[in-house]
Amino acid sequence: MSTVYTRPLARLIEQLQRLPGVGPKTAQRLALHLLKRPDSEVQALAQALLEAKQQVGLCSVCFHLSAEPVCEVCRAPSRDEGTLCVVADSRDVIALEKTREYHGKYHVLGGLISPMEGIGPEQLHIQPLIQRVSQTAVEEVIMAISPSIEGETTTLYIAQLLKPLTKLKGAKVTRIAFGLPMGGDLEYADEVTLARALEGRRELD
């Protein structure tokens, strides 16, 4: 990095650039802003980061982010046990919860099948999904995966795995009706679009 920065500042900017969506200019702006803040604020930020990293893990049931062994959604008796919404990661759970239209349970895959990145089905939480569907009273599995190439691959792969199981149980696999362009991310859709996508879901053949 340019010698215009002192070494500690250069290191801070480099680390900030590792964050998603943060380029060199944004990293510089954030770093300079932090240096102007009182020590107490910077220490509070650092402490919050450490606590989140140390205390937040994955729910043992659905693999959503949780500070407890089982997350609030999985523990809630008011949630519909008959519907299970499959998403790529926790950002999608947050986006769907904001719609206030979905009242079932979730299953977080932890990513998407992507041979180019070396991510196969075995790296995702697909087998636990199959076990949940086979062992619980799930009547509908909703595939809420972004319509990218990786998303389509993952959706169709899981649908094929679930097909004999859901047929045996009299259940169904559906997918949400995206109002997104190909490659659009679920987390960036507004609440109205997501709510309509849930309402307009259709069964996968």
From Swiss-Prot:
May play a role in DNA repair. It seems to be involved in an RecBC-independent recombinational process of DNA repair. It may act with RecF and RecO. Coiled coil: none annotated. Keywords: DNA damage, DNA recombination, DNA repair, Metal-binding, Zinc, Zinc-finger. Gene3D superfamilies: 3.40.1360.10, 6.10.250.240, RecR Domain 1. CDD domains: TOPRIM_recR. A zinc finger (C4-type) spans 59-74. One of its GO terms (biological process) is DNA recombination. This is Recombination protein RecR. The gene is recR. GO terms for molecular function: DNA binding; zinc ion binding. PROSITE patterns: RECR, TOPRIM. It comes from Cyanothece sp. (strain PCC 7425 / ATCC 29141). Residues 82-181 form the Toprim domain. Belongs to the RecR family.
